[in-house]
């Protein structure tokens, strides 16, 4: 298929996917990892940064991504609440989940914090290795 006059031709055929030609050695996939992504929410950016920094200091997570402006609608104490929150995506390993749960009891500002752990089945090998290294018990 070609574009109108004045534009370069665009091929819709798939590229040659030969591994030695296409893949960056840092982009190899790691299957069946022990990595997890933990979801939680807090009320504002200040609470989010405070929580993530403390979890990083304790090596309970390798990374915390803050997604400001999330809107949560939920039932709480018999009423429907509609709140702006900050969603946190916490990258860690399943081996750190018990310690992370204990830290949530101590540090999380909510009475009933969201703590949902999602298994990461597949990820870039270097990234998975990085998560493991940053949350290693031997480094605490």
Question: Language-model features: where?
Answer:
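Positively charged, small/polar-rich N-terminal and surface patches that mediate targeting and assembly
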Residues: 17-140
């Amino acid at each position: 298929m070609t574009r109108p006059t004045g534009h370069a031709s665009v091929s819709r055929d798939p590229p040659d996917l030969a591994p030695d030609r296409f893949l960056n050695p840092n982009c190899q996939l790691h299957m069946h990892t022990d990595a997890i992504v933990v979801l939680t929410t807090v009320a504002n950016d200040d609470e989010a940064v405070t929580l993530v920094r403390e979890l990083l200091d304790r090596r309970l997570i390798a990374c915390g991504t803050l997604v400001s402006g999330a809107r949560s609608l939920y039932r709480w104490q018999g009423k429907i609440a509609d709140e702006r929150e900050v969603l946190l995506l916490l990258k860690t390993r399943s081996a750190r989940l018990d310690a992370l749960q204990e830290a949530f009891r101590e540090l999380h500002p909510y009475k009933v914090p969201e703590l949902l752990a999602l298994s990461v089945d597949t990820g870039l090998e270097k990234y998975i290795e990085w998560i493991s290294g940053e949350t290693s018990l031997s480094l605490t």
